Amino acid sequence: MRRIFFDYLYKLMGKNKDIYIIFVGLGYPRYKEFKKKFSTRTINTEAAEQTALDIAVGLSMSGKIVFTYTITPFYWRAAETIRNYISHEQIPVIMCGAGRDNDYSKEDGYSHDATDIQSLMAIKGIPCFFPDTKQELRKKMRELIKKTIPSFLSLRR
């Protein structure tokens, strides 16, 4: 699903100059591919989740369509921005989380936690989507870039 996500996002960014992607220390070598083609609209904050979401909020408030990408549980490192701005102020940031169910269960203790998606869903005002097919994923991405609300998109490994 991640490959399909990045392939389709690449296509969407080629058609819409208002779409940005913020990588949060994840996504190589796709980051390099995006940076080469969309240098001013591709950002990598490395392990700075709070910074990534703060940048996403600012870009979104200036009219840009912003995707962020990291491993799902890492979004909790930016909980303050998610709660105070993205959720409370309904800033339309599209948070994409890699890993669902047991995708990262063999990696380490902090990259996998079955409660993370459910906890993120509990934040008021952030609808969450769990596409299972490439058709569902592409359709949901097309819908999300047209919406003016925040969202979370879960991507299987």
Predicted regions mapped to residue ranges:
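Thiamine diphosphate
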Residues: M1-R157
